[in-house]
């Protein structure tokens, strides 16, 4: 039964009863124990502070609908611009989000131009790649299973000439990765539809075309690729992240393992006929993301985001990895490129027990020298290094783990008003929401806090793509229905005055005398407190304002609900009648409200009811109600009328009396 709002009595209804499942259905003891364990685990997870503190809906005008449902989208945005390009089915959408104005959209049609297909679902032209090339936009799509590319210049579409194999897959459902670096192009897309079933990482444009050996990866799912410019140009590396089938077939071993692979960008292939067209510097290492304290392992890599060091030190680039386990719980582990590089440079090879050849496998050679055949043969037969890549920090554990299933991540490095640096993670969930998580401190003593859950769309849907514009401090997200621009600050969602603003621990926001504002929009210094356990104590007023008193008159023996909005999921909510606790709602409660149900109102249940929110040492009164008997309420109403009549009488008589006194 849906609770009526406060102020309305509930209609009569039978008392709810809870049946004991084991007793009712005679479940076996082992299953009963499993049920008890599952309920206890679910309850424990509900108390985790890794969940978002509040939930917020982005109500801005920066939403634009597609002209049709788009089951597959690709997003392209250039930092600092107001434009977003989105590739859909036979269309490229150009969205414009000017500051302070409504968003607009233009559409360019790019239909199928050739090819024949048997499955009608694959007969469209699904755009899978958008990339700036010269003064135009390179657009590549499936083109009815005959992948092709076009150049888009000023809304004019021209088909690209020349060999374009490897730029787009044959189906939008295929796992694919394309990396551009200057005139070089790297791809994991097969060139032919009906051969080359084994996935490879290729250089498809550059000095010489190369591909990985067919034995070095087992059914890989590619996640991210990047090029890292190191101290010497010949030492520049290509790193790509993927997961693959676990070669360990032990029934207790995980099905998948997560990897990072390295290649030398200057790799020219080998000397022999077997190695001349292959990458000769391929090595791979396992990415570890596990928590020994809870015995939880997260072995399925979902996404990777690289955050460069602000001083330009490539070794200090932070690699944020989102992992999941078979139960769809998630963890975020952070690695450094320096640690990854060290593992590849110093580790022995797994399963190889002889002396390593010189140059050692994976080593980049100057002056474009070819890799000796012996070095290639050792690396090709033993491509995995023995040492594993572990997270940063002394404990080598995840930054945090959560019961939520995270799928994508972007990270913004920002400075608060006092100059302190924070890393703010934006993680997409399988529920179509975004979690905003702040990380501060050094790798030895990090502070992590889940600020909020953002609902970015007008129409709830899965998030297909996300892009961060650090310059304009915006997120761009797409679903099958719409594209949305979301600001990184959103300070207006925090209620509760100064205390509520500071309790958010949002580094983008601060208290400016009378409201919670973005530090980027305020013209003067604002009050902020991010790390402390008691940020509310920084406010000038020691206590938050009390809730306004609300009164309602009720007849005896009636039913009634009192509702208290649960703004913070980290707080415990208590309904008190006078001094007695009548109802408690614990942290992590998924209900939007803490409800006190009065089934049969008696004389002693009239009086004052207060809903208190307790969050650490922060205590505030969220609701204050007084339940009055109907006869008393009527008496108070009559007394109020009498006072009003008396006041009006004296207001009419006093001028006459005063005038009389003045005359005499």
From Swiss-Prot:
It comes from Mus musculus (Mouse). Residues 265-267 are annotated as: Interaction with integrins. Its main location: membrane. One of its GO terms (cellular component) is plasma membrane. Residues 647-664 form a propeptide. Residues 542-627 form the Ig-like C2-type domain. The lineage of its organism: Eukaryota, Metazoa, Chordata, Craniata, Vertebrata. Belongs to the semaphorin family. The keyword Cell membrane applies. The gene is Sema7a. The keyword Methyltransferase does not apply. GO terms for biological process: axon extension; inflammatory response; integrin-mediated signaling pathway; neuron projection development; olfactory lobe development; positive regulation of axon extension; positive regulation of ERK1 and ERK2 cascade; positive regulation of macrophage cytokine production. The modification Asymmetric dimethylarginine is found at residue 132. Residues 53-488 form the Sema domain. Disulfide bonds join 117-123, 140-149, 264-364, 289-333, 491-509, 498-539, 501-516, 564-611, 585-594. Disruption phenotype: No visible phenotype. Mice display normal levels of lymphocytes in spleen, and normal activation of T-cells by antigenic stimuli. In contrast, production of pro-inflammatory cytokines by macrophages is much reduced. The effect on contact hypersensitivity and experimental autoimmune encephalomyelitis is controversial. Reduced size of the lateral olfactory tract. This is Semaphorin-7A. A lipid is attached at residue 646 (GPI-anchor amidated alanine). Interacts with PLXNC1. Interacts with ITGA1 and ITGB1. PROSITE patterns: IG_LIKE (PS50835), SEMA (PS51004). SMART domains: PSI, Sema. It is found in: Cell membrane. PANTHER family: SEMAPHORIN, SEMAPHORIN-7A. Keywords: Cell membrane, Developmental protein, Differentiation, Disulfide bond, Glycoprotein, GPI-anchor, Immunoglobulin domain, Inflammatory response, Lipoprotein, Membrane, Methylation, Neurogenesis, Signal. InterPro entries: Ig-like_dom, Ig-like_dom_sf, Ig-like_fold, Plexin_repeat, PSI, Sema7A_sema, Semap_dom, Semap_dom_sf. Glycans are attached at residues 102, 154, 256, 328, 600.
